[in-house]
């Protein structure tokens, strides 16, 4: 059964006098339990339509989730959605699982006449939002969207003039939220310093022997750690959009779309560690009036390999949208084709580790030369790119009916 603007406002506890005076009212309603929430979100759809909604929700789940054995977040949400927007019964176990959500605060908004000429953001990741309007005028440059929040949007008359903002192809969008990007992996550790060269020797008292030995090469820098995975997206949630009187204006149509939450990008791999410093050359020996040369320093160690980029997050499936318009106005609603939520791309590989510094030459013995410094190490290599997340989120359906 259709309700008037003022009847809906009264149910929300909004003052008729204030609304008649042109005041927009926004309030928070405390809902005590899930039955009260279902009652609050009744949109006037007849029993047969509500039954169709429940069947459509469950038709996407195979096998049908059993309340006793299937307690995943997705399964619970599906059964609760079928209860609130359809006529499916809710099992006692699901009631217990959702009990902690109550009492719940619901955002309610009423305005007798509202004109918008810019995007109207109804919120992100809130409990529930209810919008009650008499006449909504959407001028050029306007659009309406909500993210990861259940919505009940009821308006008597819509006047749609002009087009949405640039790069926006919808008038009303029910969206999810992209998962958070993974954080970068930790850098690899610095390679150890190379060992010192052997000391020079005297072959006999007063007679020089061997020069100092060369320092050994520094150790390779550590491999960077793998970037952290991107977060899974947050789903687009169920919405009812009801126009009780009609849609007019130029072009006088409403374009509706939905897309769930894409997976977040994987984190960048950690930078490879710096190569270790080359070991010092061994000192030359002093043998009476002569000595031996110091040994050359060791080469710096190679830089470490960058860490592999993190795995992208999963796109998550969206929930259904129910649009009701007056008889003869089905053509006033344009449904955009479903847009699936992509999986997040893998993170970039970590940068190469820096080349290790050269080791210093050993000092020379009496009247002998010190050893030369070693060479720098080579830089490491770039880490591998992370892999894309494993799941694409299927968009919810948009159902349009006369009522």
Question: What does each of the following model-derived ranges do?
Answer:
Residues 2-211, 227, 231-262, 320, ...:
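Extracellular beta-helix/beta-solenoid repeat scaffolds
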Residues 140, 144-149, 169-238, 250-322, ...:
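Glycine-centered low-complexity coil/loop motifs and glycine-rich tracts
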